[in-house]
UniProtKB/Swiss-Prot annotation:
Belongs to the HMBS family. Disulfide bonds: none annotated. It catalyses: 4 porphobilinogen + H2O = hydroxymethylbilane + 4 NH4(+). The keyword Transferase applies. This is Porphobilinogen deaminase. GO terms for molecular function: hydroxymethylbilane synthase activity. The modification S-(dipyrrolylmethanemethyl)cysteine is found at residue 243. It comes from Bordetella petrii (strain ATCC BAA-461 / DSM 12804 / CCUG 43448).
């Protein structure tokens, strides 16, 4: 295998996105010491729209389009993403080439006054950026007030610190990667807040005509994480998964046995449809599809129809 002379990684400009890209850069430099690995920092539309939730302005694709443009015009060779922000169906000519080992997939409870969601008094304001978290919080704690929370990690924490929220819920991996794990008051187990498909994992996107990159990037891929994420994203794909759908999917591997949990909820949390499926890891795609079909059969289809065509108020 010939060693690349130079590789350029496209990344978003946020501190967390830069950490993720630098992590991949450092892994590549260790693998290929003679290769010059550089970062191309870009601002995406998702980074610019901070006054509305993603579910109202176009969803996950807002975080990848500018990076894909850089892949297309040759300014970058690969793009690094937080996998939960990547649409399940990438448009041609793009593909996910490698999925790295997953970090902590759980959601984190962050507050300056309280230790858990259960400690919050009635009417306390909880901030979160996703309908998935919002619906699960509303189901378990209907006495709380859940409000949208946008911005990068530092912005979200500053909004908490100035008193806009009593608590916020966000992905644990982001805090831990940036050395801010001490801000976490408690971790929400999957039983309490089922994670998003791909949460905690990083994905590398390339153009599908870059066969050379597939070979060079293969050592970064984690087969166990990939199996779990394939099952999770199969659920999301079958249900038209986007930021507009309160959808969660989380798989775990025990040996070669893959166990998948998934749910679809109404945004107000009054209806939560759950599914569990298991099987050999090599059947990850089929396991995800089976879980999605069970969700649809048990009432998720009605929730999805309402989200696509909300009733007139």
């Amino acid at each position: 295998m010939s060693v690349p002379q130079r590789l350029v990684i496209a990344t978003r400009a946020s501190r967390l996105a830069l950490w993720q890209a630098e992590h991949v850069r450092d892994r590549l430099r260790a693998l290929y010491p003679a290769c010059a690995v550089e970062l191309l920092t870009l601002t995406t539309r998702g980074d610019q729209i901070l006054d509305r939730t993603l579910s109202k302005v176009g969803g996950k694709g807002l975080f990848v389009k500018e990076l894909e443009t850089a892949l297309l015009d040759g300014r970058a060779d690969l793009a690094v993403h937080s996998l939960k922000d990547v649409p399940v169906d990438l448009q041609a000519p793009f593909e996910l080439c490698a999925i790295l080992e997953r970090a902590d997939p759980r959601d984190a409870f962050v507050s300056n006054q309280y230790t858990t969601l259960a400690d919050l008094p009635a009417g306390a304001v909880v901030g979160t950026s996703s309908l998935r978290r919002e619906s699960q919080i509303r189901q378990r704690y209907p006495h709380l007030s859940v409000k949208p929370l946008r911005g990068n990690l530092d912005t979200r924490l500053s909004k908490l610190d100035r008193g806009d929220y009593a608590a916020i819920v966000l992905a644990a991996a982001g805090l831990q990667r940036l050395g801010m794990g001490e801000r976490i008051r408690s971790l929400l187990e999957p039983e309490d807040s089922l994670p998003a498909a791909g949460q905690g994992a990083l994905g590398i996107e390339i153009r599908n005509d870059r066969n050379d990159l597939r070979e060079w990037l293969a050592p970064l891929a984690c087969s166990r994480t990939t199996a779990c994420v394939v099952a999770e994203r199969a659920v999301s794909r079958a249900l038209g998964g986007s930021c507009q759908v309160p959808l969660a999917a989380y798989a775990e591997l025990n040996g070669n046995s893959l166990a998948l949990r998934a749910l679809v909820a109404s945004p107000d949390g009054t209806r939560v449809i759950r599914s569990q499926h298991a099987g050999p890891a090599e059947q990850a795609q089929a396991i995800g599809q089976a879980a999605a079909q069970e969700l649809l059969s048990n009432g998720a289809d009605a929730i999805l129809a309402e989200l696509q065509d909300p009733p007139a108020s």
